[in-house]
Regions:
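Sec-dependent bacterial lipoprotein signal peptides
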Residues: 1-23
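OB-fold and OB-like single-stranded nucleic-acid-recognition modules
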Residues: 23-195
Length: 195
């Protein structure tokens, strides 16, 4: 009888440890952002997350050879056919992102700050059927994760051109009204609970 209680206690202890460890899938928790392994990982590993649109506005030539990653919400999608090649330009409102995936009882995993550093744009070639299939997954209102080189500064946006990689996250997977934060090290606050 004593051995059964010992085994039961050990199993119970292991179960409690697994459920409270924050491991996604077993229980609620958070983890570092996971880029898509096949398409996004190499860019994520190389890109700087500490260069923001206002840095580029203040020093336009200072980051032209620096691969950066910016996040935002797509506000407009524009096709440009002339001059060739056919391009798609995505405009986005920049939002700060803490690079954390929150896995809990709410559906959303990504909590962008309502704040950001203005508009940015990226262009993508859309000449072939495969290019168009890729572009078709993006829509106004999607969260955009864009990797590129900030080489163009306009009065109303900063462009990552050439763009190296893009990822769309549909609106049901992110929110902008839960956490308010800025650049790393700046104060943050909870605006409301996610559920």
């Amino acid at each position: 009888m004593h051995i059964y209680r010992t085994i039961l206690a050990a199993l119970l202890l292991c179960g409690v440890a697994a459920l409270t460890s924050g491991c996604p899938g077993l229980a609620p928790g958070s983890r570092a952002y996971r880029p898509l392994p096949q398409w996004e990982s190499k860019f994520s590993a190389q890109a700087r997350r500490d260069v923001f649109p206002n840095d580029v506005r203040q020093k336009p030539d200072g980051f032209t050879n620096t691969l950066v990653v910016w996040t935002g919400v797509i506000t407009n999608i524009e096709y440009i056919a002339d001059p060739p090649p056919r391009m798609v330009r995505f405009y986005a409102a920049h939002h700060y992102f803490d690079w954390i995936e929150d896995i809990s009882i709410q559906r959303e995993r990504f909590f962008l700050s309502p704040r950001g550093e203005g508009a940015f744009a990226v262009q993508w070639i859309a000449q072939t059927a495969d290019d168009q299939k890729f572009v078709d997954q993006f829509a106004v209102g999607d969260m955009l994760i864009a990797y590129g080189y900030p080489t163009v500064v306009r009065s109303n946006y900063v462009a990552l051109n050439p763009a190296q990689n893009l990822r769309a996250i549909k609106p049901q997977w992110y929110r902008t009204d839960i956490l308010d934060y800025g650049r790393p090290g700046e104060p943050s606050k909870i605006l409301k609970t996610a559920w």
